[in-house]
Curated annotation (Swiss-Prot):
Domain of life, per lineage: Bacteria
GO molecular-function terms, A-Z: rRNA (pseudouridine-N3-)-methyltransferase activity
Keywords in alphabetical order: Cytoplasm, Methyltransferase, rRNA processing, S-adenosyl-L-methionine, Transferase
Record: residues binding S-adenosyl-L-methionine: 94, 113-118
Record organism: Sorangium cellulosum (strain So ce56) (Polyangium cellulosum (strain So ce56))
Protein name, entry field: Ribosomal RNA large subunit methyltransferase H
Length: 145
C-alpha cells in the first residue's frame, strides 16, 4: 500500500511542520507515504493539480460534510481502499475554501475528520496523525505517543 496526502497550501509554521514530519516518518515505517503540497489558487488551477497528484489512486476527499469515522473505522477504510487497484490511496485536503466541487465529486469517497471546521493546515496534521494511528491499529500495535 502507498498513501498520498495531497493538500493545498504550504505549511510554514515550524512546530506544525515538525509534527507532520514526525508522523510521516512513523507512517513510513509501515508503508510508503508521500506528501504533496499544491500552491493555493483559483479552483480552475488547483483542481487539475489535485487530480494529477492523485492519478491512479483511490481518492478520498477530506471534507467537513464527509463521512464521520472513528479511528477504527478510519483504519478499516484505509485498509479497504488500499487493497483496491494499484494499492494507492490519496487523501485530498483543500485550501481555505475547501476542495473544488469537481474534485470532490470525482472522489471515490468523502470523509470528515470532525464535525468541527479546522484550518486546512491543522486538518492536514490531524489527517497525518490518524493515518499513523490507522497503521498501528491495523497491525494490532500499541499507539506510540
Amino acid at each position: 500500500m502507498r498513501l498520498v496526502v495531497a493538500a493545498v497550501g504550504r505549511v510554514k509554521d515550524k512546530p506544525l511542520r515538525a509534527a507532520m514530519d514526525e508522523y510521516l516518518g512513523r507512517i513510513r515505517r509501515y508503508v510508503a507515504c508521500d506528501e504533496i503540497e499544491i500552491q493555493d489558487g483559483p479552483p480552475a488551477k488547483v483542481g487539475p493539480l489535485l487530480a494529477r497528484a492523485s492519478a491512479g489512486a483511490s481518492v478520498i476527499a477530506m471534507e467537513v460534510g464527509g463521512k464521520a469515522l472513528g479511528s477504527e473505522a478510519f483504519a478499516a477504510g484505509v485498509e479497504r481502499w488500499g487493497s483496491r487497484g494499484k494499492g494507492v490511496v490519496a487523501f485530498l485536503i483543500g485550501g481555505a475554501d475547501g476542495l473544488p466541487p469537481d474534485v470532490s465529486a470525482a472522489a471515490d469517497d468523502r470523509w470528515s475528520l470532525s464535525p468541527l471546521t479546522f484550518p486546512h493546515r491543522l486538518a492536514r496534521l490531524v489527517l497525518i496523525e490518524q493515518l499513523y494511528r490507522a497503521m498501528t491499529l491495523l497491525r494490532g500495535e500499541p499507539y506510540a505517543h
